[in-house]
């Protein structure tokens, strides 16, 4: 939840008393024109920047830096290390989220098959198309099974077929997360 968030940049107020409460298991979208403050709010929630005033909560308690390990974030500005091999980089990113190497490889292989990119495991990132790289980044965002997912412009650069694939996976993840939280 975000309560009464205000954020100013120089002479521009990007967020003016914004409050939002998203129930567990829910899927929300932030809609608005360019410059409306969507990315600013996301950057505040993910603690990339701070609000000028207001409060943030995660599961009913004040949000703290260690909560970021329980959140998956796919930023609008995508970036992978171009010279690394795809699989090597995906394992590295999984390890940063606390997944051991063998478990990371197993989970990644499952996701790579689901997204039909298993043939790219040993290729360098620079050989990937923009859409393929975005699939890898989506996978590394959700791999550690975060309790909350935040996507900024998740469908940007995808063709219609892959937009549908990504939508399906986001909905499936939302359903799975709500089932776990309900204790089912």
Which sequence ranges carry the predicted segments?
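Conserved ABC ATPase signature
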Residues: 124-131
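Conserved ABC ATPase "signature" region
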Residues: 91, 95, 103-120, 171
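Helical segment within the ABC ATPase nucleotide-binding domain
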Residues: 163-178
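A short, proline-enriched helix->beta-strand linker immediately N-terminal to the Walker B motif
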Residues: 143-147
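Helix-to-loop junction immediately C-terminal to a conserved catalytic motif
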Residues: 46
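Catalytic Walker B motif of ABC-type/P-loop ATPase nucleotide-binding domains
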Residues: 149-153, 158
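Conserved ABC transporter NBD signature motif
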Residues: 54-69
């Amino acid at each position: 939840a975000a309560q009464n968030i205000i954020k100013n940049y120089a002479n521009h107020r990007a967020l003016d008393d914004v409050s939002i409460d998203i129930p567990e298991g829910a899927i929300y979208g932030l809609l608005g024109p360019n410059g409306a403050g969507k990315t600013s709010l996301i950057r505040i929630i993910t603690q990339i920047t701070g609000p000028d005033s207001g409060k943030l909560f995660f599961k009913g308690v004040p949000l703290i830096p260690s909560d970021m390990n329980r959140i998956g974030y796919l930023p609008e500005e995508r970036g992978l290390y171009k010279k690394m091999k795809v699989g090597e980089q995906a394992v590295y990113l999984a390890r940063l989220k606390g997944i051991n190497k063998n478990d990371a490889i197993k989970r990644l292989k499952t996701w790579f098959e689901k997204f039909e990119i298993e043939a790219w495991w040993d290729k360098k990132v620079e050989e990937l198309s923009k859409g393929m790289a975005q699939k890898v980044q989506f996978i590394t965002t959700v791999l550690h099974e975060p309790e909350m997912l935040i996507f900024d412009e998740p469908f940007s650069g995808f063709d219609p077929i892959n937009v549908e694939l990504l939508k399906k996976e986001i909905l499936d993840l939302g359903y799975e997360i709500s089932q776990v939280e309900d204790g089912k």
